[in-house]
């Protein structure tokens, strides 16, 4: 399997960064080809420019995003590692989805019906790895926007039998060192079996 691991957290000493390293190493250790994208380290710009928006339906990624678009085309598994902030994806991760998964990369419009036709049918796995400051109950009440974005909206564009996984640590701010270590271990084991 070819896995693209997309990571969003500004701090190199964060639990999220540990999860990113763990995910990439576990996948590689299981024999998968792995490419990691550290959006903050790359200086990825979250906001779509006016020029990008004007050319949105020209079926081509902006030149600065060509490498990211090619990696999406290359991958058959997408893994997202990030902290949940304000009950959703960090702005940089949401920006990556909006700027990279554009017409010509993620989908195109049928010429006659103008309905969305997927260009991500090669994606067989979507995995989300995240931490929440809130409890499971609070996240459920707020409808878990990040999970819905990745496992529903993105999943709809993927292969018909695309499998998904959601690996989450809730109440991370009050979790113990042992709970965080156990979560890292569970992520490692789960991805080693992907």
Language-model features: where?
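Active-site donor-binding loop signature of nucleotide-sugar glycosyltransferases
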Residues: 39, 131, 169-171
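A structural motif corresponding to the C-terminal end of an alpha-helix
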Residues: 75, 81, 121-122, 156-162
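Short, glycine-/small-residue-rich phosphate/pyrophosphate-handling segment
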Residues: 108-156
